[in-house]
Amino acid sequence: MIKPKIALTIAGTDPTGGAGVMADLKSFHSCGVYGMGVVTSIVAQNTLGVQHIHNLNHQWVDEQLDSVFNDTLPHAIKTGMIATADTMETIRHYLMQHESIPYVIDPVMLAKSGDSLMDNDTKQNLQHTLLPLADVVTPNLPEAEEITGLTIDSEEKIMQAGRIFINEIGSKGIIIKGGHSNDTDIAKDYLFTNEGVQTFENERFKTKHTHGTGCTFSAVITAELAKGRPLFEAVHKAKKFISMSIQYTPEIGRGRGPVNHFAYLKKEGLDDELSK
C-alpha cells in the first residue's frame, strides 16, 4: 500500500466549517492527501461574521506541534490565522528545524466580514519571523496592502508589492490574489518568484458565498506541494479548484456562505470511487 502524502495546517477554527482548520482539512482530503491540524485560536464565527476569538497560549500550540513532529513529518505545511507574536516564534522554531519542508503562509488578517484578526504589533512581527521562511505567501489585496503599506489600486502597484515581498521581506514566492478587486469579470492572480512573474486568470463569479476562499486556495497549494508538484502547477490546480468551489457553492448559512470543498472531486468524477 502506498503511503499518502501528509499536509499540516496550523490555523484557527470555524465551527461552521467554512474557514480555518476545518476548511483546510476538507481541501486536503479533496486533493488526496492526509490532513493534520494544529489549532492556534478557537474562533466563534459563522457566515454572518466573527463573534468571539480565544487565542490559545503559545505553549499549547507548542505541545500540539511537538506531538506531530515527534511522531511523523508532514510533506508540506501551511499556516493561517496566527494571532500572537509568541505563537509565531513557536512555529518559527519548528520551521527552522525542518527547512526542507515546503511552507505556505496564508496571512489571515481580516475575516470576509471585515473583522480584524491580528493586532498591529503582530502584523509587524509576521514580517520578521515567518514571511522570510515562506516558499509562497497568498495574501489577497487588503492583506498585501497591510503588509507592504501600499495602496494597491493598479497593476503597477501589484508589481511593486510583489517586489517588496521577494526583494525586501525575503519570501521565495508570493501570490497576490486579485479576487477582491471588482473592476472586471476576470479574477486575476499574480505569482512572483525570483524567476519573474506569472499570471493566472479565471472567470469571476457573482456570488456573496466566498467565506473561506483564502484558506481553501492556500490549502490546495499546500496539498499539491506535498505531492511534490512544482509551485506553478500547484497554483494552477488551486485556481481551478477554487473556481469550481465558488461556482457550485452549497449556499449554507444566512450570510457569506462557504465554498464547496468537494466540487472539484465531483467534477472530476472521483466522488463515486471515494464513497465505495
From Swiss-Prot:
GO biological process, one term: thiamine diphosphate biosynthetic process
This protein's pathway: Cofactor biosynthesis; thiamine diphosphate biosynthesis; 4-amino-2-methyl-5-diphosphomethylpyrimidine from 5-amino-1-(5-phospho-D-ribosyl)imidazole: step 2/3; Cofactor biosynthesis; thiamine diphosphate biosynthesis; 4-amino-2-methyl-5-diphosphomethylpyrimidine from 5-amino-1-(5-phospho-D-ribosyl)imidazole: step 3/3
Positions annotated to bind 4-amino-5-hydroxymethyl-2-methylpyrimidine: Q45
Lineage, highest ranks first: Bacteria, Bacillati, Bacillota, Bacilli, Bacillales
NCBIfam families hit by this protein: HMP-P_kinase
Gene3D superfamilies found in the cross-reference section: 3.40.1190.20
GO CC terms: cytosol
UniProt keyword annotation of ATP-binding present: yes
E.C. number: 2.7.1.49, 2.7.4.7
Protein name: Hydroxymethylpyrimidine/phosphomethylpyrimidine kinase
Function description: Catalyzes the phosphorylation of hydroxymethylpyrimidine phosphate (HMP-P) to HMP-PP, and of HMP to HMP-P.
Enzyme class: transferase
One MF term in the entry's GO annotations: ATP binding
Protein species of origin: Staphylococcus aureus (strain Mu50 / ATCC 700699)
InterPro entries: HMP/HMP-P_kinase_dom, PM/HMP-P_kinase-1, Ribokinase-like
Any Pfam family the entry gives: Phos_pyr_kin
Keywords for this protein: ATP-binding, Kinase, Nucleotide-binding, Thiamine biosynthesis, Transferase
Nucleotide-binding as UniProt keyword: yes
Reactions catalysed: 4-amino-5-hydroxymethyl-2-methylpyrimidine + ATP = 4-amino-2-methyl-5-(phosphooxymethyl)pyrimidine + ADP + H(+); 4-amino-2-methyl-5-(phosphooxymethyl)pyrimidine + ATP = 4-amino-2-methyl-5-(diphosphooxymethyl)pyrimidine + ADP
Domain of life: Bacteria
Assigned protein family: Belongs to the ThiD family.
